Amino acid sequence: MGSSSPLTRRNRAPPSSVSSVYLIFLCFFLYFLNFSNAQSSPVFACDVAANPSLAAYGFCNTVLKIEYRVADLVARLTLQEKIGFLVSKANGVTRLGIPTYEWWSEALHGVSYIGPGTHFSSQVPGATSFPQVILTAASFNVSLFQAIGKVVSTEARAMYNVGLAGLTYWSPNVNIFRDPRWGRGQETPGEDPLLASKYASGYVKGLQETDGGDSNRLKVAACCKHYTAYDVDNWKGVERYSFNAVVTQQDMDDTYQPPFKSCVVDGNVASVMCSYNQVNGKPTCADPDLLSGVIRGEWKLNGYIVSDCDSVDVLYKNQHYTKTPAEAAAISILAGLDLNCGSFLGQHTEEAVKSGLVNEAAIDKAISNNFLTLMRLGFFDGNPKNQIYGGLGPTDVCTSANQELAADAARQGIVLLKNTGCLPLSPKSIKTLAVIGPNANVTKTMIGNYEGTPCKYTTPLQGLAGTVSTTYLPGCSNVACAVADVAGATKLAATADVSVLVIGADQSIEAESRDRVDLHLPGQQQELVIQVAKAAKGPVLLVIMSGGGFDITFAKNDPKIAGILWVGYPGEAGGIAIADIIFGRYNPSGKLPMTWYPQSYVEKVPMTIMNMRPDKASGYPGRTYRFYTGETVYAFGDGLSYTKFSHTLVKAPSLVSLGLEENHVCRSSECQSLDAIGPHCENAVSGGGSAFEVHIKVRNGGDREGIHTVFLFTTPPAIHGSPRKHLVGFEKIRLGKREEAVVRFKVEICKDLSVVDEIGKRKIGLGKHLLHVGDLKHSLSIRI
């Protein structure tokens, strides 16, 4: 310090002078200490108990409506202070009793250590790590989606109460898994817009909804990302930072937007994150139509819009969309961006204001959305231990119930793709089980990306060894092995009653910023599988751990390979779930949430083409089960059980008449479709109403209890480039052996049977619609 030098130079003074100087120094030190303590950053915002003077501030008055509290707070801030609340590491305002706040935390499938807002310690060393989202989606169980969200938010609140976590979580990822090579497909609920929408709203509700049911309060704040048409990370040199997704309005409204709409409209999500990429030449984080127009205008978001990390910087530096940083800051804020993950807005917004590019009122609007969210979370209500979730703590993390839910989620999601009758295995008939493969004894691989520290791990090897005697050999040093230990693996398999090969991928193969270039098994794994199958004494089971699918046609057609399981990235309890299914303690019920294509598909389809619909002229085959008609390795919805289910139609109309107004144009002309909105939709069934019911009797014809997902698909008339089929609904049912029950679907005619036309408008096709459940088909005619 500058004042210390003169004092230290006085060491030559007589003793009496030294004493006087010492007393002066001591008084100065005590004064400075008291002043520093008085000015130190508060721990909790509006902690009136610790600082009674804060009670005078309107924004600290919990009796007032949140909107009034927000307005009061914004009015008290300087421009520089306001700008400090535009960035993810928000500055505190000591004079108002507001601490700093880190917005960035993640909770994709459990509380994560990704993002600076959350960390683990000896107090809370780990949190429940659920399966990666793609496997949870394979359960097709909406109540499970919500239950997982509820556990994750409880553990997050418990960690927040002891200073280890934030309240704002930038999860879930609800992008459509459009291309099988995408490295982040593992984070998503799959390729179907309805499934993705159901997952989005279900998980968000689990995270956000409070026990008291107050819709204006949040348990934690979720964030649906990455808005929008984002599904290229790094493919053959094409990076997300510069990629321009060229998307038709039809595909935008039919495929890419529905999960985000469901997040906001059905899930009441508190936040949406805009993505790095451009859409049709505009950066998503600077597009007023996408942000202010759709998210906040049409969908009525009650919360904040945040950029992906450094997205505003990216649109300036990588995309060269603006000439200056100040322009980038201004157009993003004016487009509707409220918060910048990163520091860009903190560095350049003041210059944008001084240059007249953006006014202070726009900044007020942005930070008001941020404060609104924090107030709904109780951040401005003082010590969290005195609030609704104040009793939560470390003992509420990694509870036995939470860990069992993680295991059950993996069981429900695992998909049985092939079974020649070998499965389930009988432990009594197995003396030796060979466990081979690079993923057989992995830990971190099981939890995928955006992970946290799990409560504990149970590897596939540990799960299997808990039931029967096992011998183990990796066979490959890693999933991308250049050399496989074929000799050792075949020797092991040649003496075992059954051989289990646990293979697949990990984050070195598919991840954020890492897209695949082909659909082959990595490294020498295919050769390892082929040779083990040839040499094995007994049946061979293939367990595939991955986010995306592989072309495993060779294994599908190999008679020595008796069973194939896809287990996604099954989470901390993956080994338990795998063993439970292999040994028949759990009857598999998972269904693929994405198509598994042959290698030939990706050889002719660039990842950068965003079109969903096929183009006969160019030979482009289209994407996902809704439009692709070519050969598949395994199809969307595939998944076997240890029992057999059959379906019988009980109830469904054969004809629906849409009554039109007298002056409707289609009364005097040949119309192929009608707008999917209007009086004709509200009175579409006899007796009035907009919906009808489909009843399906489901019978379990086997001798084993089972859980079955019933899919209701529809094939609409061939108009407006309609899908070859699309999912109308799905229901899960548990049936005992030889038991039957009726599953009921409510079909909203103009919502569920409509298609999106070329300009993005929903239309209900006139003519023949085909409803189908499994092999069961029913024709429905819609006319005027």
Curated annotation (Swiss-Prot):
Q: Which cysteines are joined by disulfide bonds?
A: none
- The answer on whether this UniProt entry bears the keyword Nucleus reads no
State which tissues express it: Expressed in flowers, siliques and the apical part of the stems.
Gene Ontology MF: a single term? xylan 1,4-beta-xylosidase activity
Quote the catalytic residue positions.
D308
Q: Which Pfam families does this UniProt record tie to the protein?
A: Fn3-like, Glyco_hydro_3, Glyco_hydro_3_C
Q: Which reaction does it catalyse?
A: Hydrolysis of (1->4)-beta-D-xylans, to remove successive D-xylose residues from the non-reducing termini
What are the record keywords, sorted? Glycoprotein, Glycosidase, Hydrolase, Secreted, Signal
Residues in the signal sequence: 1-38
Q: Which PANTHER family does the protein's record reference?
A: BETA-D-XYLOSIDASE 4-RELATED, SUGAR HYDROLASE-RELATED
So what family is this one in?
Belongs to the glycosyl hydrolase 3 family.
What's in the misc comment field? Might be processed at the C-terminus.
Task: Quote the protein name from its UniProt record.
Answer: Beta-D-xylosidase 4
Species name: Arabidopsis thaliana (Mouse-ear cress)
Lineage runs:
Eukaryota, Viridiplantae, Streptophyta, Embryophyta, Tracheophyta
Q: Gene symbol?
A: BXL4
